[in-house]
Amino acid sequence: MAQVAANGARQPLLQLLRGPSGKLWEVCIGLEVHAQVLSRSKLMSGSAASTLSSARPNRNVSFFDAALPGTLPVINRECVHQAIRMGLAVDATVHPRSLFERKHYFYCDLPLGYQLTQQRAPVASGGALHFELPESAVVSEHGGAHSDEATFDASKYKSRKEKNEALKKWKAKQAKKQQDVISRSVRITRIQIEQDSGKSNHDLEDDSTVVDLNRAGTALLEIVMEPDLRSPVEAGQVMRQLQHLLRHLDVCDGNMEEGSMRCDLNVSVRPTNLGAEADVESLHNALTARTAAPFGERVEVKNMNSIRNMMRAAEYEARRQIALIEEEGGEVHRETRSFDAVTGETKRMRSKEGAKDYRFFPEPDLPPLVFSEKLIQEISERMPELPEALKERLCAQYDLTSYESLVLVNEPGAAPYFETVAAQNSRPSKVVVNWVLNDLFGHLKAVNGDIASSPVTATELGALIDLIQDGTISGKIAKDVLELMFYENEPKKTPLQIVEEKGWKQIQDPEEIRALCRAVLDDPKAKKNLDAYWKGKTQLFGFFIGQVMKQCGGRVHPELANSIMQEILEEHKQ
């Protein structure tokens, strides 16, 4: 996939796919997300809201859920409040009046024969979901109109010196890309409340189908987005951001693998009428001109149970449409397809229904939902600090980079953990964020854990950082202490107790350090290196310090060791 950054790297990226003929195509992706609302009971009945497939089948089913004649719906107030929270979080307009409608279709796991939804008068509409994409996540699949080097090509350089200098610049560029983020947003069309269906199980030995109605009637939030996304990478990041926001608000647990958060894709493509030889400006002009070709017919893709599979489905479907047009001369028709995670392909299910097919009409058994300004204000005041505001505050208050704040906010529990550690002024925020993001996260990743399951509390990590700051231990020793705290701290010991038991306190006595330095330089084996040092090979200074560290297991205060070694070398010179 080629990327074109029009008018500078901070502009939205135009991400293109190359077709079989070499022509570049633009991809358009829209998302519809269904999130099961966290609530004790279902949307229209008092039955327990069941989100786990492990629950006993048909245990949490009321008469209304089973569509027994004469039963009436009773709206769950908490589910409605959850929808308002979500609308406020994305700066949508929360409408003072909304309506439920019946959407008719016939599945064996939909007892009513219709779904209660909000097609024409949703709880909220408009707004946008803001997200940030690490620049390093945008990877070119080939050269072409624009491509950044993803790997270092050593064959371009004749001499070792040229290669080393180029490699150094390349590494610096890659490090900067890792820290840089691209800010984007996707517009929200509407946020509506609706009922979930039951669950059909077709995987039986006798080819029969059984129906579990535990899920039937569970409250869903349908979040419909405008087709603003231009790559599977963007779509994946939007899903991660939405998943994090839903969890942050405690609206949905966001577990796609368990079906509590589901996503439908709408994918279409259009040609740029330009080939690989086109420059960045030509591509930008072609794609933004009024004469640009419209996007083709969209295809809906269902059945993705993870963000990774959603991204795979988006890319496959875009390539399928391009190949259909270029190689077969065919047309893309509006249809619904499913994604096969095993083959990585989308497969036709049915032609796409329109609004007329569903025969929408107002729900006669439910009055309109009416929200006062006072209610909306009360819900707003009870909401937690939103991720976007939290990122901005972390950057301003602690002088973090956009990338650092992005990682802290997107990892559940990481931002409060960081702020607890950094609470005391003696702990520099840059030191703290490095220990959290690099060292602590490294151990958590190794055991597939998260902040909530970390055996090292924020207070304990802060105490460890204090030992570095006051010179009790070196940064290198601190890493060893953290490893013991993480994997072998039973019974529980403080960082200081571990340091004292292991004898790892840093040597800070100048006379003791001076004796260690003299021992290294007075060693007959050091004469050759000393001669080389005086002849200009000053990088051997690091070797001498390394020998000092080796003598005492790395416990010497590095700054004192450097200073004293420099003094002794000057004495030797005289």
UniProtKB/Swiss-Prot annotation:
Function: Allows the formation of correctly charged Gln-tRNA(Gln) through the transamidation of misacylated Glu-tRNA(Gln) in the mitochondria. The reaction takes place in the presence of glutamine and ATP through an activated gamma-phospho-Glu-tRNA(Gln).
Listed GO MF terms: ATP binding; glutaminyl-tRNA synthase (glutamine-hydrolyzing) activity
Family: Belongs to the GatB/GatE family. GatB subfamily.
Annotated signal sequence range: none
Subunit composition and interactions: Subunit of the heterotrimeric GatCAB amidotransferase (AdT) complex, composed of A, B and C subunits.
UniProt entry keywords in alphabetical sequence: ATP-binding, Ligase, Mitochondrion, Nucleotide-binding, Protein biosynthesis
SMART domains documented for this protein: GatB_Yqey
EC number, UniProt record: 6.3.5.-
Biological process annotations from GO: glutaminyl-tRNAGln biosynthesis via transamidation; mitochondrial translation
Protein location: Mitochondrion
Reactions catalysed, as given in the entry: L-glutamyl-tRNA(Gln) + L-glutamine + ATP + H2O = L-glutaminyl-tRNA(Gln) + L-glutamate + ADP + phosphate + H(+)
First-listed, main subcellular location of the protein, grouped into a coarse class: mitochondrion
Miscellaneous note of the record: This protein may be expected to contain an N-terminal transit peptide but none has been predicted.
Entry's Gene Ontology cellular component terms: glutamyl-tRNA(Gln) amidotransferase complex; mitochondrion
The UniProt record lists the keyword S-adenosyl-L-methionine: no
Protein name: Glutamyl-tRNA(Gln) amidotransferase subunit B, mitochondrial
Stored Pfam families: GatB_N (PF02934), GatB_Yqey (PF02637)
InterPro entries: Asn/Gln-tRNA_amidoTrfase_suB/E, Asn/Gln-tRNA_Trfase_suB/E_cat, Asn/Gln_amidotransferase, Asn/Gln_tRNA_amidoTrase-B-like, GatB, GatB_Yqey_C_2, Gln_synth/guanido_kin_cat_dom
HAMAP family (UniProt xref): GatB (MF_00121)
Cross-referenced SUPFAM superfamilies: GatB/YqeY motif (SSF89095), Glutamine synthetase/guanido kinase (SSF55931)
